[in-house]
Amino acid sequence: MNALAATNRNFRHASRILGLDSKLEKSLLIPFREIKVECTIPKDDGSLATYVGFRVQHDNARGPMKGGIRYHPEVDPDEVNALAQLMTWKTAVVDIPYGGAKGGIGCTPKDLSMSELERLTRVFTQKIHDLIGTHTDVPAPDMGTNAQTMAWILDEYSKFHGHSPAVVTGKPIALGGSLGREAATGRGVVFATEALLAQHGKSIKGLTFVIQGFGNVGSWVARLIGERGGKIIAVSDVTGAVKNQNGLDIVDLLRHKEETGCLTNFSGGDHMDPNELLTHECDVLIPCALGGVLNKENAADVKAKFIIEAANHPTDPEADEILSKKGGVILPDIYANAGGVTVSYFEWVQNIQGFMWEEEKVNNELQKYMTKAFHNIKAMCQSHNCSLRMGAFTLAVNRVACATTLRGWEA
């Protein structure tokens, strides 16, 4: 089951729990707007190349639409649609005043020079500038994009609309970015993990962790868990996997990856088959990479009691069912990885106010939002006798449905 089908399934289940009528359910499911554009740019060698870009604006009942822009060869309308819808529920779960959107361009960033990436970004912005905006749709970085990409979008957009720092988030600090944004998704994952463990009478200290993915999110998760006394016994990324039952030294591992570009040949651990990482014995498993990694083929062999979905859609519905029957506790992606969009909201607020927060304030506010959201999810679970995933979806769908009804849009 692909990401769109799984997201729709979760939404419909939440709708049934809430007793939404079919007309309202349909209006919440259909995207507000789907945009497809062709972006033709001159390459460095003088040839022309055309790339297809997408922006799906799913819902704006609770506020401006919010979501990343990814540059990846496998970007397609279904994936963008699913991720846009997921952003609607994600922003609603943590109760920030946004709806959901997502965008992307089908390209391979590593095959493009910096100047080609800049031209592509500016052309894409020219095509969609009148459909995004501070109070309309606010993009952010995603897979294959970064703060520099946002700087180009900001600059190109400002040519048409004047200086508009709040039109994108995840910007460089010098252009209005927020302190704490780089670590925000990973830090949010850790705050979410702490909230879940506390509910089970546990803490991070002394537990064993396995982390799949060691990019921005995974590396920050590892660093922050290590600081709290957690024992990270295995880590993987696209270059390989490394384990140490006594605990990996994350500072050394980060230094090794920075120097070599990979996890392999790390002296502080042993090589392991990346395919065995997800089923490695541990207390807490944190997938931080791609979707669909936990499926019906490997779910029965997963040994972790707690699974924290730092990636988007890492668990197939079939795996979800298998893991739940085994007594596994899954913290769903629409909550667990919402730290990034929450601090994006803080950045947007700072830009509108023209007043920058200290990093300590950013982190403290993030902890408040993540902790409060967890307690709201648990309350939904208790009210409807459902899983954490359905508690999160039910909470989110109910908030969006209420806003939609109050606006009179459901008819």
From Swiss-Prot:
EC no. given is: 1.4.1.3
For the biological process aspect of GO, one term held by this record is: amino acid metabolic process
Q: Which residues form the active site?
A: K102
Question: What reaction does this enzyme carry out catalytically?
Answer: L-glutamate + NAD(+) + H2O = 2-oxoglutarate + NH4(+) + NADH + H(+); L-glutamate + NADP(+) + H2O = 2-oxoglutarate + NH4(+) + NADPH + H(+)
SMART domains according to UniProt: ELFV_dehydrog
Coiled coil start-end: none
Q: Which keywords does UniProt give here?
A: NAD, Oxidoreductase
Q: Mention one GO molecular function.
A: glutamate dehydrogenase (NADP+) activity
Tell me which PROSITE patterns the record gives: GLFV_DEHYDROGENASE
**One Pfam family hit:** ELFV_dehydrog
InterPro entries found in the cross-reference section: Aminoacid_DH-like_N_sf, Glu/Leu/Phe/Val/Trp_DH, Glu/Leu/Phe/Val/Trp_DH_C, Glu/Leu/Phe/Val/Trp_DH_dimer, Glu/Leu/Phe/Val_DH_AS, Glu_DH, NAD(P)-bd_dom_sf, NAD_bind_Glu_DH
Q: Which CDD domains match?
A: NAD_bind_1_Glu_DH (cd01076)
Under the heading PANTHER family, the entry gives:
GLUTAMATE DEHYDROGENASE, NAD-SPECIFIC GLUTAMATE DEHYDROGENASE
Q: What family, per the record?
A: Belongs to the Glu/Leu/Phe/Val dehydrogenases family.
Protein's recorded name: Glutamate dehydrogenase
What is the gene name? GDH
